[in-house]
Design a protein with these regions (language model features):
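Conserved proline-anchored active-site loop of SAM-dependent methyltransferases
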Residues: 112-145, 154, 177-212, 226, ...
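Short glycine-biased active-site loop of nucleotidyltransferases that positions the nucleotide triphosphate
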Residues: 184-186, 281-285
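Class I S-adenosyl-L-methionine
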Residues: 2-168, 172
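Short loop/edge segments at beta-strand edges and connector loops
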Residues: 175-179, 272-273
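Long, Pro/Ser/Thr-rich low-complexity/intrinsically disordered regulatory tracts in eukaryotic proteins
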Residues: 216-217
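Conserved small/polar residues in nucleotide/adenosyl-binding loops
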Residues: 288-291
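Conserved Class I SAM-dependent methyltransferase catalytic core
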Residues: 155-159, 220-278
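Glycine-rich, phosphate-binding/catalytic loops in enzymes
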Residues: 147, 171-172, 209-213, 259-262
Length: 291
């Protein structure tokens, strides 16, 4: 089924509305509310939220192809404003959503389930699980099916997405901040790191990487996928597993310093090229990736 932008935007609005209600009423989600929260797909394929949408007159500044999304985008802004304590918080929520547009492409459940199933088939039963770019926790759900007693630490930088994640997994450590905020005591801590990590030439500043004697670690800060890979390797214990979906640039780049650093820290078990239309239905994007 093709990516339906209007339906995805509607799903996102209802999930955000539900999260605000749960916050306001200070309670856990019902089964029906969990289903609404789980339909949230992020805004990676919904660049319409970058357009002005505070007033009805803003419609004249929208492209004709996007006009069907104008009314729900106005509704989204109204919903966020009505549930913000002041204009500053409203702006923080909106700016955070807009910043996520470049990286918030969520993974089909069939893929996360398959990866979790393969790990289980090889008797990987992690007690401590890291998800460094969680979205609403599709990977978390998949791996917990096989390891229901595991402790999970997940990171989600976007404020509203992080709120939804927290309501979906109230008994786990869901952190609404960037992965670079993970503390040093969690180095060599996790049995498994699993994620569809963000990718692109987005820089990440990490003081530990900046001070490193390794050129590969310092240069990894220049591309977010390289940074996440090395930071994930740092967090996993000896004998642990990193299972990431990532950009083809990790293996195809002509610059080898980051790759050399990865192979210095870990052994490659498997690499699989995924079809470039795999994420079309979920995020409206085409990209060659690896896991």
């Amino acid at each position: 089924m093709a990516f339906n932008r209007k339906q995805k935007l509607r799903d996102n609005i209802e999930a955000i509305r539900t999260a605000f209600i749960l916050d306001r009423e200070n309670r856990t989600a019902t089964t029906e509310e969990r289903a609404i929260l789980q339909r949230y797909c992020g805004f990676g394929g919904l660049k319409c939220i970058l357009n002005p949408a505070k007033e009805l007159t803003d419609a004249v500044r929208w492209a004709k192809s996007d006009l069907e999304l104008f009314a729900p985008t106005v509704e989204l802004h109204r919903l966020i404003r009505e549930n913000s304590k002041d204009e500053t918080e409203y702006k923080r929520f909106v700016d955070s959503l807009k910043a996520s547009v470049l990286t918030a492409f969520y993974t089909p459940k069939e893929i996360t389930d398959t990866i979790a199933d393969v790990l289980a088939d090889y008797s990987v039963r992690p007690a401590r699980i890291l998800e460094p770019s969680a979205g609403v926790g599709v990977f978390v759900d998949s791996v917990l099916r096989h390891s229901p007693g595991a402790d999970v630490m997940a990171f989600e930088k976007d404020l509203l997405t992080g709120t939804i994640l927290r309501h979906l997994y109230p008994d786990q450590k869901m952190r609404t901040c960037g992965f670079e905020k993970i503390e040093r005591p969690f180095n060599n801590y996790f049995d498994l790191a699993v994620s569809n990590i963000p990718f692109g030439d987005i820089a990440v500043f990490d003081p530990e990487f900046q001070r490193s004697d390794s050129f590969g670690r310092r240069s990894a800060q220049n591309a977010i996928h390289n940074y996440f890979f090395l930071k994930g390797l740092d967090a996993v214990r000896d004998g642990g597993i990193v299972a990431f979906i990532t950009s083809q640039g990790v293996l195809n780049s002509t610059k080898t310093s980051v790759r050399d650093e990865m192979f210095r820290q870990a052994h490659l078990v498997s690499a699989i090229r995924l079809p470039n239309n795999l994420f079309t239905d979920n995020a409206g994007t085409r990209s060659e990736e690896h896991t």
